[in-house]
């Protein structure tokens, strides 16, 4: 099967375990998410606060904790794919079904971001029979629970 992500060699992998607690990534088995169109790695964004000091014209700022971290992407829907079926099923579990996930970067250093996340958004795009019709896609958001571990 051809993977859409192959054009840049960036891939998203989904862990098979949904146990509580989840196993360490090295003890889980993973499957590549097929027909991946795009994936955005989780961002690092700190909360910030501002304050003023009396008789000082400059505003001061301080950084806090990491904001919510998400990974957004889309895929070409293949409803015969067990992975796509599992992702859709996970998206309607109250409280979120957490899994291990990782993204492999397309760089020579083979960077890998490991994280625990649940599917918080699963949106099927509109069917479009217009001149510029494209494959039916699904947009998704993975909400990270905890830290993102980077390995090379």
Question: Each PLM stretch: what is its role?
Answer:
Residues 80-118:
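Short, acidic/charged, Gly/Pro-enriched secondary-structure junctions
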Residues 78-81, 147:
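Acidic glycine-/aspartate-rich tracts in secreted/extracellular proteins
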Residues 70-74, 100-102, 139-143:
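Beta-strand secondary-structure signal
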């Amino acid at each position: 099967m051809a993977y859409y992500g192959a054009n840049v060699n960036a891939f998203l992998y989904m862990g098979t375990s949904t146990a509580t607690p989840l196993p360490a990534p090295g003890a889980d088995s993973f499957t590549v998410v097929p027909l991946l169109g795009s994936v955005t790695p989780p961002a690092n964004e700190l909360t910030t606060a501002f304050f003023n000091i009396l008789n000082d014209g400059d505003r001061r700022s301080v950084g806090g904790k990491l904001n919510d971290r998400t990974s957004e992407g889309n895929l070409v829907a293949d409803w015969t794919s067990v992975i796509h079926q599992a992702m859709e099923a996970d998206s309607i579990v109250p409280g979120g079904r957490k899994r291990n996930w990782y993204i492999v970067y397309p760089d020579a250093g083979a960077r890998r971001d490991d994280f625990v996340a649940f599917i918080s958004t699963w949106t099927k795009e509109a069917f479009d029979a217009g001149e510029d019709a494209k494959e039916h896609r699904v947009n998704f958001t993975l909400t990270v629970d905890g830290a993102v571990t980077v390995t090379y």
